[in-house]
């Protein structure tokens, strides 16, 4: 209890997030067929936060703060332009992240009114995930050899003790070799870079009525074989 946990990789070269990568989450958000290729975006290093740290509610977008519990992998070697067959050789281990998302402008995006056309809508969605402390990560990194099958892990997100997300990682649309091979065509990943593999179903924006986080709430994400990432909002 006296130990302060920082993000396991406090200053990676890159934090990369894959989006819409769980079948049931894709259905709850858009009900469209699975894409041909992965989709994703870069998050700032300043968004990283350790387990047990407080997620600060931003005054400019305080009302629609969402959770996204995600299974992550960490690179152990420099990786660029690799094949799917070789991709897992570059993975050092696994951890957990919460892709916290401020969604206050979602109603305007859905209206499609200026300045919220498709391009600006996507941009606002990504900006809402990049506020300081909006990528809690941890509590530890488990080495690759400690996880027999990364697609057979139980992932659960709890808000104030209530289960919000409850899934197995076998619902991933694009598995790790596909993600690594696809994005390494462009990016050069470095040791310590963190990749979040996408959120499962059960996010707050996908519920009716919506469920969002507020100051005083506690959000926990538990991944089988890794541990529990826990943060409060302040």
Give the role of each language-model region.
Residues 1-39, 156, 218-222:
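N-terminal non-catalytic cap/leader segment that marks the start of a structured domain
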Residues 25, 56, 103-234:
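Catalytic-pocket segment enriched in acidic/His residues
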Residues 32-51, 65-67, 214-224:
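Structural signature of FAD isoalloxazine-binding scaffolds in flavoprotein oxidoreductases
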Residues 13-16, 38-40, 46-47, 54, ...:
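Structural motif
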Residues 5-7, 28-31, 56-65, 78-86, ...:
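A generic local secondary-structure boundary/capping motif
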Residues 46, 51-103:
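Non-heme Fe(II) oxygenase catalytic core, chiefly the N-lobe of the double-stranded beta-helix
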Residues 19, 41, 73, 99, ...:
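A residue-level signal for conserved active-site and pocket-lining positions in enzyme catalytic cores
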